[in-house]
UniProtKB/Swiss-Prot annotation:
Keywords: Cell projection, Cilium, Cytoplasm, Cytoskeleton, Flagellum. Microtubule inner protein component of sperm flagellar doublet microtubules. GO terms for biological process: flagellated sperm motility. PANTHER family: HYPOTHETICAL PROTEIN LOC690617, TEKTIN BUNDLE-INTERACTING PROTEIN 1. Microtubule inner protein (MIP) part of the dynein-decorated doublet microtubules (DMTs) in cilia axoneme, which is required for motile cilia beating. Located at the center of the tektin bundle where may function to recruit tektins or stabilize the bundle. One of its GO terms (cellular component) is axonemal A tubule inner sheath. It holds the Pfam family TKTI1. It is found in: Cytoplasm, Cytoskeleton, Cilium axoneme; Cytoplasm, Cytoskeleton, Flagellum axoneme. The gene is TEKTIP1. This is Tektin bundle-interacting protein 1. InterPro entries: TKTI1 (IPR029203).
Length: 209
């Protein structure tokens, strides 16, 4: 009973006012995790202010955070130049942060950790292997029936040996509708019946004199 009275006499501090988890310092490149379904990594964008004399405007200076690379072609959102041996500064920096967690895990859990931690809806998951993956599924270009190109649906996988039409690319000659050629002098002006595949008899037109 006396213990309860002593605890009641203490000043109560709401837990919401206490900073339990201290944020990463601005000069740090440590990867933080965004709260969500996949907990993707993120780097706090550190914005510093240059020291300026009194009375002058301070210019904002964006410091290096790790998501950018020294080479613009090797940015994190671009595909690597050499798919067999890609080198990503941001990926290597992220992998070094999570490498200590992968040492005590099986290979299946390690793969799941990479997919969930380095998740981006635009680019596939970053793997050292040249095989392309999208999430946990291996991406392969398979001929799916009904999903080929509409222009040459019946000629899927067959390259035409002759030059295709300039109006609609890769459109086969029997399916080319009349009036799609660039030369209007070759247009057939006679009426055509698609059901009977016949043309109407030529009508008598007065010849100009």
């Amino acid at each position: 009973m006396q213990t309860l009275r002593q605890e009641a006499a203490r000043p109560c501090i709401p837990s919401g006012t206490l900073e339990a988890s201290f944020p990463a310092p601005l000069y740090s490149d440590d990867y933080l995790s965004l709260e969500g379904s996949r907990w993707p990594p993120a780097i706090r964008q550190a914005t510093r202010w240059k020291y300026t004399p009194m009375g002058r405007d301070a210019a904002g200076q964006l410091w290096y955070t790790g998501l950018t690379n020294s080479d613009a072609w090797e940015a994190w959102y671009n595909l690597p130049r050499a798919p067999a041996s890609p080198f990503r500064e941001a990926y290597n920096r992220w992998h070094s942060c999570y490498q200590h967690r992968e040492c005590s895990m099986p290979s299946a859990y390690t793969q799941h950790l990479r997919e969930t931690a380095w998740h981006d809806p635009i680019v596939p998951a970053q793997y050292q292997a040249p095989s392309t993956r999208w999430g946990s599924a291996l991406w392969k270009d398979r001929p799916i029936r009904g999903k080929e190109y509409v222009l040459n649906r019946n000629r899927y996988g067959v390259e035409p040996l002759w030059r295709a039409s300039d109006y609609v690319p890769s459109l086969s000659a029997p399916q080319r509708p009349p009036g799609t050629t660039q030369n209007y002098r070759e247009w057939v002006l006679e009426p055509y019946c698609p059901s009977t595949c016949q043309r109407s008899p030529p009508s008598l037109t007065p010849t100009p004199r």
